[in-house]
């Protein structure tokens, strides 16, 4: 019975940004739940190993080139994905980037890189895929946000702006597309050890600092997202839309002491 609740057999999921890191973990979780995948990267050759890994799980994986900063690339990917499977059920908008600099050092190009990738790209990929979902009256769109969707951090101005925008965008699209049977939610990880931020975890004082503020006292590991992504992609999330699900070990509680240790 439990397996039936979260069974994605027969579903087709697009996961963007799957050449490495978090996108691959999310794709694995969906494949293990039974979904067939479309996997994307700016360099399609970078997807070969991951494609074989998904096929070894007994699922299909169609690799497609995608640059989320290029409108024509988005349209080509959406058309090719729909042609490959005949339908698209699930979209995981995972492709993203970051620039870590003091706000006074952020350049025009830095800002555009992050916002174009994380926010504009997220919208136009969702738009392109929704056009294929609407005729079928069904869809699950999961935008990958961050704890920075709800909190600001020094040195991350463009990233925080983009992820805050993702949260608001999620609510707007949920309102727009709900009548068509499409749910739109935001999955927002906290401080996770990923390739994108591995340099932070080489700094032991920083690790101690951040873990002290996480009630569960450890950074997230990518597999901590497995249950959340499968739930949001499944039939069991049918009445959940427009929401931001924080998977952050509790850091969003504020996680500061109101008492002093004796």
Q: What kind of region is each of these model predictions?
A:
Residues 126, 162:
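Active-site helix of classical SDR
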Residues 2-5, 151, 230, 241-262:
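Short C-terminal tail/terminal secondary-structure segment
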Residues 104, 151-157, 179, 217, ...:
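Active-site loop immediately N-terminal to the catalytic Tyr-X3-Lys motif
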Residues 131, 175-179, 238:
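Alpha-helical segment proximal to the catalytic Tyr-Lys
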Residues 146:
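Residue(s) in the substrate-gating loop at a strand-loop-helix junction
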Residues 102-103, 107-115, 210:
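Substrate-binding pocket helix/loop in short-chain dehydrogenase/reductase
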Residues 12, 19-21:
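Conserved glycine-rich cofactor-binding loop
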């Amino acid at each position: 019975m439990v397996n039936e609740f979260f069974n994605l057999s027969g579903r087709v999921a697009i996961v963007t940004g799957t050449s490495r890191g978090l996108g691959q973990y999310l794709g694995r979780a969906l494949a293990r739940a039974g979904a067939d995948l479309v996997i994307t990267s700016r360099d399609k050759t970078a997807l070969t190993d991951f494609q074989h890994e998904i096929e070894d799980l007994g699922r299909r994986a169609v690799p497609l080139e995608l640059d989320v900063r290029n409108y024509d690339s988005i349209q080509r990917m959406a058309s090719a994905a729909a042609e490959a499977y005949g339908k698209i059920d699930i979209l995981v908008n995972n492709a993203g980037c970051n620039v870590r600099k003091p706000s006074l050092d952020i350049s025009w190009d830095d800002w555009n890189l992050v916002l174009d990738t994380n926010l504009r790209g997220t919208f136009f990929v969702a738009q392109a895929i929704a056009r294929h979902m609407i005729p079928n009256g069904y869809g699950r769109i999961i935008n990958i946000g961050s704890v920075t969707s709800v909190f600001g951090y020094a040195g991350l101005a463009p990233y925080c702006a983009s992820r805050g925008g993702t949260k608001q965008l999620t609510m707007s699209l949920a309102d727009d597309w709900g009548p068509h049977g499409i749910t739109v939610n935001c999955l927002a990880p906290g401080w996770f050890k990923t390739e994108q931020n591995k340099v932070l975890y080489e700094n032991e004082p920083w690790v101690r600092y951040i873990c002290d503020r996480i009630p569960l006292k450890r950074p997230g590991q990518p597999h901590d997202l497995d249950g959340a992504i499968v739930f949001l992609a499944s039939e069991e999330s049918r009445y959940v839309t427009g929401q931001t699900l924080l998977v952050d070990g509790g850091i969003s509680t504020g996680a500061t002491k109101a008492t002093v240790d004796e």
